[in-house]
Curated annotation (Swiss-Prot):
Stated role: Probable polymerase.
Biological processes, Gene Ontology terms: viral RNA genome replication; viral translational frameshifting
Name under which the protein is recorded: Putative RNA-directed RNA polymerase
GO MF: nucleotide binding; RNA binding; RNA-directed RNA polymerase activity
Domain of life: Viruses
Enzyme class: transferase
Family: Belongs to the luteoviruses RNA polymerase family.
Alphabetically ordered keywords of this record: Nucleotide-binding, Nucleotidyltransferase, RNA-directed RNA polymerase, Transferase, Viral RNA replication
E.C. number(s) listed in UniProt: 2.7.7.48
Keyword Nucleotidyltransferase: yes
The keyword Endoplasmic reticulum appears for this protein: no
PROSITE patterns recorded: RDRP_SSRNA_POS
């Protein structure tokens, strides 16, 4: 046993070991103490070691403190009496008086006077001698009483030749005195730490002036009934620091504390100084400070922020003190640090929306009972505290999905139906766009059904081959277009009330009719949209590298660009019968195929059934996009781009469009921004609720498909938001063992590294996952099973990771996009670089991660979260 090695160690080594364990490793300290008690008295050679160890242990109990105080008081009285008697004897003998008087002076507690030169009488000497004997007797009685107290409280072995009573009581007194000194010092430091900081408000040391911009405006004034025109200079309000020493001092304090409030880890390295300068620039722009004030604040902040104050140093000392570390140890246990790391499980959710009880939905009993797991699994160390869940496959969720996603658009307990388009508005305003697409596409061939079947994975492939054989014997008929819906099992970020979504596929026989015509010609039709707009418009066919460059090029077309995000609320639900017929007109114009035309006509009226639990739901709807149709994605892009092109034409503006179905971003000149104020009313005429986002005036703030442009080594690339870390740390796949978890981590990491080479934070996260998986090799089929459709679109077949250095330029661009400054980026990257993600399967459902979302500036309610 390790403790036995200490028996032969030196006294200093044993003392150091005990001190270290007592301050840092309490569990080992208590184990060591228990071991000492076990070996005590068993072997005489060990007793000396035990006594020495107990002599070094300072775990003081309450009764000892009282005894130590009384012992110290009595010992001082004895020493004072002894030194006084010694002085009197010296004065009587007239030898060594000075030394005796000095000794008495140092030991006297005050109140006893003894002149330096006098000759005491015999009676005085006897009286002082008797007093000393009395004090010694009282002290002896006290020690007997104290020894009995120790035997009662600690047992007979505690006080011994190595740990005698007087040494123990002196040790207790010293420890208690030290504790009092520490308490006084702590109170002093506490008073300094919690003293209010005198920081004046910005408005108190600045003033606002109006200055000429150099531009002129025409002003019309009426004089004597006649209008007179003349030019006046355009004035602009500018804030500046007042020209006084007090104002400059206040400004210095203000900017220092403001920057430290943003980031308290900044120092004097190149990246920190660049970060400080950017913070000052942002503050200056926010408060419209003049250039002189910005320059002054930058100079001050560059000098004052990197240099720690005494308060900063003391704060760090307090946080890293042994006592502070000891207090954090129990919290590490309570927060499950260490032993709850791994893959945890969260159960599904029930939608909070009430059932409306629509008569259009028929619910019948007698169906086969279906049980579908809705558990979601997540890596406890990297999920950022973001809660993702999947909807339960329950009757309640099914009814909510049908009522809220198919029939109604309201969020309350009343049935509010989607708006209807104006009569013939698609034909009247978008007929030219339809004809342009047909003309651009030209001839499209019909592909063999076998090719369609072979484009799917093994399970679906067999079903399609069976459908092909069926079509050879039984021709296509209308029943093949019937829909069997099911709840979509997907990750939902639980930040607001959610209505689950439906997947509404038709039969494989139906899909063969559409797929052989539309699936393999989709890119050709999408490029036709680009041709009509005059630039790449549908960006879903490009990887995130190419998307970033396209969007940057669109942005650079305008002198003063602005980006307006547009999102069609629940697009599929708002696709009307009129919109479908307009879309189908494009396909029919391209192919001229009667079988395709018949199949498309069957999309107008949809007979839908849905099985959930032991119930069957039946409902019928005219119009509406069925999300399982092969033409869902392409059709939505055609409709949205057609409406946008007609809108641009109506406004007569030059604008660029970035489209990915129902998600759009309009880029135009800032002078045209006001023209788009009527967008909601315009699209309402087409039957769509179009939600516009707040315009942005910086390229890095443009958000498209939950990504933003970031300049990586001088080239713009679309980079996913930081909350993607939490999303990629969750999976809907079943994980049976650690090998499954490592395969999942490897698949996510390999794709993530391809997309995020050279990207701050994200590259380190995916490297961490890949390293933790043991660099496990996984098949292409498994990768496609793990990654989402959106990630697959961003990759566009890329599988090669090209290592790219993270430059300061990239860090500054990432900061502009996501609000995480370069120093925080480095801190997060160091965390991931030193982290090994556990693949252990855990039974617990809720844990708190080390790295939480607030450090990455992830808002609790993101504007892009769908209802």
């Amino acid at each position: 046993m390790f403790f036995e090695i200490l028996i032969g160690a030196s006294a200093k080594a044993v003392k150091d070991f005990i001190s270290h364990c007592y301050s840092r490793l309490k569990s080992i300290y208590y184990s060591f103490k228990r071991w000492l008690m076990e070996i005590s008295g068993q072997f005489k050679a060990h007793d000396a070691f035990v006594n020495m160890c107990f002599g070094h242990m300072a775990d003081i109990e309450d009764f000892e403190a009282e005894l130590a105080e009384e012992f110290a008081e009595r010992e001082d009285e004895v020493e004072e009496a002894r030194s006084l008697l010694k002085l009197l004897v010296a004065q009587k003998s007239k030898t060594g008086v000075t030394e005796a008087w000095t000794d008495f002076f140092t030991k006297s507690r005050g109140g006893v006077y003894a002149p330096l030169s006098c000759e005491p009488t015999r009676q005085e000497l006897e009286a002082k001698s008797e007093k000393l004997e009395k004090l010694l007797e009282e002290q002896h009685q006290f020690e007997v009483r104290a020894a009995k107290k120790y035997i009662k409280e600690k047992g007979r072995g505690f006080i011994n030749c190595w740990n005698d009573l007087r040494s123990r009581l002196r040790l207790v007194k010293d420890v208690k005195d030290e504790a009092k000194d520490n308490a006084r010092a702590a109170a002093k430091i506490g008073a300094e730490m919690f003293a209010p900081v005198d920081v004046q408000d910005l408005y108190s040391f600045t003033e606002v002036k109006k200055v000429e911009t150099g531009l002129m405006k025409e002003v019309v004034k009426e004089r004597n009934g006649e209008e007179e025109k003349h030019l006046e200079p355009i004035m602009e309000e500018v804030r500046s620091i007042k020209d006084t020493a007090e104002a400059r001092d206040a400004a210095s304090t203000w900017i220092t504390e403001t920057v430290k409030l943003k980031n308290s880890t900044l120092n004097a390295d190149e990246l920190s100084l660049a970060t400080i300068a950017r913070y000052v620039e942002n503050v200056g722009d926010k408060f419209k400070l003049d250039i002189a004030s910005k320059t002054y604040l930058k100079q001050v902040a560059s000098m004052s922020v990197p240099i720690p104050t005494n308060k900063d140093i003391k704060l760090k000392m307090v946080l890293q003190s042994p006592e502070a570390r000891a207090r954090r140890e129990p919290l590490d246990v309570l927060d499950s640090v260490g032993f709850l790391e791994g893959l945890c499980t969260a159960s599904g959710f029930e939608s909070p929306f009430p059932i409306l009880g629509l008569p259009e939905i028929a619910v019948t009993d007698g169906a086969r009972l279906r049980k579908v797991s809705s558990n979601i699994r997540y890596l406890s160390q990297t999920h950022l505290g973001l809660v993702y869940k999947a909807p339960n496959a329950s009757l309640h969720n099914a009814l909510v999905a049908v009522e809220r996603r198919v029939f109604t658009v309201g969020k309350g307990d009343k049935a509010i139906y989607p708006p209807r388009p104006e009569h013939d508005i698609f034909t009247d305003t978008m007929d030219y766009f339809q004809k342009s697409i047909i003309e651009e596409v030209g001839y499209c061939r019909t592909y063999p059904a076998q090719l369609l079947a072979n484009s799917y994975s093994a399970g679906k492939r067999a079903m399609y081959h069976k459908a092909i054989a069926s079509l050879r014997t039984v021709p296509y008929h209308q029943k093949d277009a019937n829909v069997q819906a099911f709840l979509k099992k997907e990750k939902h970020w639980m930040t607001k009330d959610i209505a689950p979504r439906l997947i509404c596929p038709r039969s494989k026989r139906y899909n063969i009719i559409l797929g052989t015509r539309l699936k393999f010609n989709e890119k050709k039709i999408m490029h036709a949209i680009d041709s009509v707009f005059g630039s790449p418009t549908v960006l879903s066919g490009y990887d995130n590298f190419k998307q970033g460059r396209i969007i940057a090029k669109k942005w650079q077309k305008f002198a003063c660009p602005v980006a307006i995000g547009v999102d069609a609320s629940r697009f599929d639900q708002h696709v009307s019968e009129q919109a479908l017929k307009w879309e189908h007109g494009i396909y029919n114009g391209i192919f001229g195929d009667s079988e395709l035309a018949l199949a498309l006509e069957h999309q107008i009226t949809n007979n839908i059934k849905m099985f959930v639990e032991d119930k069957m739901l039946r409902f019928k709807v005219r119009g509406h996009r069925m999300s399982g149709d092969i033409n869902t994605s392409m059709g939505n892009k055609l409709i949205m781009c057609g409406m946008m092109h007609a809108y641009f034409k109506k406004l007569g503006v030059e604008a660029e469009l970035c489209n990915n179905g129902d998600d759009c971003v309009i880029i135009t000149d800032r002078a045209n921004e006001k023209l788009f104020d009527g967008m909601y009313d315009h699209f309402l005429q087409y039957g769509f609720n179009m939600v516009t986002e707040k315009p942005v005036y910086e390229l890095e703030q443009l958000e498209f498909c939950q990504s933003k442009p970031v300049s990586i080594n001088g080239k713009y690339r679309m980079v996913r938001r930081p909350d993607s870390i939490g999303k990629d740390s969750t999976t809907l796949l079943s994980m049976l063992n650690q090998s499954d978890v490592k395969s999942y981590m490897s698949a996510v990491a390999q794709c993530g590294l391809v997309l995020n080479a050279g990207v701050p934070i994200l590259e380190s996260f995916y490297k961490c996952l890949y390293r933790s998986s043991g660099y496990k090799k996984v098949s292409e089929e498994f990768i496609k099973n793990v990654i989402s459709y959106g990630t697959d679109e961003r990759l566009q077949g890329r599988r090669t990771y090209n290592e790219t250095p993270i430059t300061n330029h990239s860090r500054m661009s990432y900061w502009e996009s996501f609000g995480v400054d370069p120093k925080i980026q480095q801190i997060v990257e160091r965390y991931y670089d030193g982290l090994t993600v556990s693949a252990q399967l855990q039974s617990v459902k809720v844990t708190t991660p080390h790295l939480q979302s607030i450090l990455l500036s992830i808002p609790e309610n993101h504007s892009q979260i769908e209802y």
